[in-house]
Amino acid sequence: MRQNPERRAALLDAAIDVLASEGSRGLTLRAVDGKAQVPIGTCSNYFRNRDELLLQIMERTHERITPEPEQLARTMSAEPSRSLVVLLLRQVHERMQDDRSCYLAMLELRLEGTRRPALGKQLNDIFSSVLEENIRFHMDAGLPGDRIDVVLLYLAVHGMNLDDLTAPGVLAPYVGTDLFDELAQRLLSEDS
């Protein structure tokens, strides 16, 4: 297997774009080669098979949507409060809007995981770990709310992102409403 990290990242980024635009059925090693504009067979030099490619796509999407450490440090320099939670929720949503193909690819991976039990188990492990990381981050930062509040925020933001990606008209009547602020106010008390 080839080990050029820049080429691997470029292939994974191309794979994310293919998965987002063509769906799981359109994701082939050859399609990734075409999207990455590399010679046919390049992708197969980096990934043994489609299953390995799918798992590495999951890892790459996580890298792409994770905030830069400097940005996160700036955000977290504020006092723990409901307002800080709202800011963090907005930033998650902004990252989704800035990298829509990454989120669409994650949705496609989730759907593929329902059809392929081995992949589904691996994705379940990854997403469970990510949720636990989010809970731990929230609690360690002293933000208001408990573990269940964090899970509810996680579910609400994922639902909002899903609608924004797939049926943006659903939330159109609420454009003037700050849904993130409403979420935080209804779920989190300042003294929790």
Q: How would you describe each model-predicted region?
A:
Residues 10, 14-56:
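Helix-turn-helix
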